Swiss-Prot record:
The gene is rhlB. Component of the RNA degradosome, which is a multiprotein complex involved in RNA processing and mRNA degradation. GO terms for cellular component: cytosol. One of its GO terms (molecular function) is RNA helicase activity. A motif (DEAD box) lies at residues 165-168. Residues 392-421 are annotated as: Disordered. It is found in: Cytoplasm. ATP binds at A53, Q54, T55, G56, T57, G58, K59, T60. Residues 402-414 have a biased composition (Low complexity). PANTHER family: ATP-DEPENDENT RNA HELICASE RHLB, ATP-DEPENDENT RNA HELICASE RHLE-RELATED. Belongs to the DEAD box helicase family. RhlB subfamily. One of its GO terms (biological process) is RNA catabolic process. This is ATP-dependent RNA helicase RhlB. It is an enzyme of class 3 (hydrolase).
Length: 421
């Protein structure tokens, strides 16, 4: 398989339902990515799939295309009731569920299949109103799905297609019992099409596939390299005292069009936000306690380009489909080596190049050996001149409600470069 972003395989080459092909081509999707080219022949033949591919390689469109085709090509279960969806797509986070729903809308519009969305933290009655009118494809997080199921707002007895997206993250967040609860209320595995996708598929995820799927075919793209080959990786060793100034200096000299900065704690994210906002950057903050409506607004502003920088905990590392992220900064090296892969996977997506810069400080440098062992290579080290770090920095802002703040639009040119030669 070629390592280019797209293969020579076209969606129109497959025996897909004409309405699905029409919807894909209307959105500009003509050629398959490698994971799509591997998955579609299997799902079109009714085979279950457990797929591993790096983020940004088209996993979402692979399972959406398969789901819509299957439902259009197979009749609904006899005597199906209005509260019985035909397909269930489970995601680990609210943001990912919302994005999958958005990606599915063009296909729903073209095919007439109805979508439903179920996630916690917001919109209970609004979501329920849609479900009560009847949906074909239900996309959601496990907690809200179980809530609706226990109250009989939904019944899973007519499910024909099941998708688990970011399955390893489901384990990380402790949702495996919820997943099994939902599976027990569906028809047997051999009476439905089952798909599981993730950037990493650990032994425990393969065990789940064996348990809940029907002889799933395991497929993977570029297994020998866990980090995208279009992502330039770079590592610095700052002292704790120089770490913030190094970050701000790097931002000034890189001048990223769109960057995500990851830190390991909510407090650290707020600290970074305060420094960057005070320095005039258009920066948003995304941590676990930000209200759902505000989270979606921040992501929308970042996607539109109204924000240049997003500071986030790992709540934003998995599954977010934000286009054209040019830089990822690991202000803290993550404690979980898999999170390193998912963090830097926010850049270098859809065939574009990207740049990942990590700071191995005194506190988190101990995480580096496990990360490099996991990704299978050493991260190239760059040096900096401590005397050239920025010093003309304003006092950081203190976070007050609302939790996001936009500095003025960045104008002019970056400050002079400050790296050592």
């Amino acid at each position: 398989m070629s390592k280019t972003h797209l293969t020579e395989q076209k969606f129109s080459d497959f025996a897909l339902h004409p309405k699905v092909v029409e919807a894909l081509e209307k959105k500009g999707f003509h050629n398959c990515t490698p994971i799509q080219a591997l998955a579609l022949p299997l799902t079109l033949a009714g085979r279950d799939v457990a797929g591993q591919a790096q983020t940004g390689t088209g996993k979402t469109m692979a399972f959406l295309t398969s789901t819509f085709h299957y439902l259009l090509s197979h009749p609904a279960i006899a005597d199906r009731k209005v509260n019985q969806p035909r397909a269930l797509i489970m995601a680990p986070t609210r943001e990912l569920a919302v994005q999958i729903h958005a990606d599915a809308e063009p296909l729903a519009e073209a095919t007439g299949l109805k979508l439903g969305l179920a996630y916690g933290g917001d919109g209970y009655d609004k979501q329920l109103k849609v479900l009560e009118s009847g949906v074909d494809i239900l996309i959601g997080t496990t907690g809200r799905l179980i809530d609706y199921a226990k109250q009989n707002h939904i019944n899973l007895g007519a499910i024909q297609v099941v998708v688990l997206d970011e399955a390893d993250r489901m384990y990380d967040l402790g949702f495996i019992k919820d997943i099994r609860w939902l599976f027990r209320r569906m028809p047997p595995a051999n009476q439905r099409l089952n798909m599981l996708f993730s950037a990493t598929l650990s032994y425990r995820v393969r065990e789940l596939a064996f348990e809940q799927m029907n002889n799933a075919e395991y497929i993977e793209v570029e297994p020998e390299q866990k980090t995208g080959h279009r992502i330039k990786e770079e590592l610095f060793y700052p002292s704790n005292e120089e770490k913030m100034r190094l970050l701000q200096t790097l931002i000034e000299e890189e001048w990223p069009d769109r960057a995500i900065i990851f830190a390991n704690t909510k407090h650290r994210c707020e600290e970074i936000w305060g420094h960057l906002a005070a320095d005039g950057h258009r920066v948003g903050l995304l941590t676990g306690d930000v209200a759902q409506k505000k989270r979606l607004r921040i992501l929308d502003e970042f996607t539109r380009g109204d924000l240049d920088i997003l500071v986030a905990t790992d709540v934003a590392a998995r599954g977010l489909h934000i286009p054209a992220v040019t830089h990822v900064f690991n202000y803290d090296l993550p404690d979980d080596c898999e999170d390193y892969v998912h963090r830097i996977g926010r850049t270098g997506r859809a065939g574009a190049s990207g740049h990942s810069i990590s700071l191995a400080c005194e506190e988190y440098a101990l995480n580096l050996p496990a990360i490099e062992t996991y990704i299978g290579h050493s991260i190239p080290v760059s040096k900096y001149n401590p005397d050239a770090l920025m010093t003309d920095l304003p006092k950081p802002l203190r976070l007050t409600r609302p939790r996001t703040g936009n500095g003025p639009r960045r104008t002019g040119t970056p400050r002079n470069r400050r790296r050592s030669g």
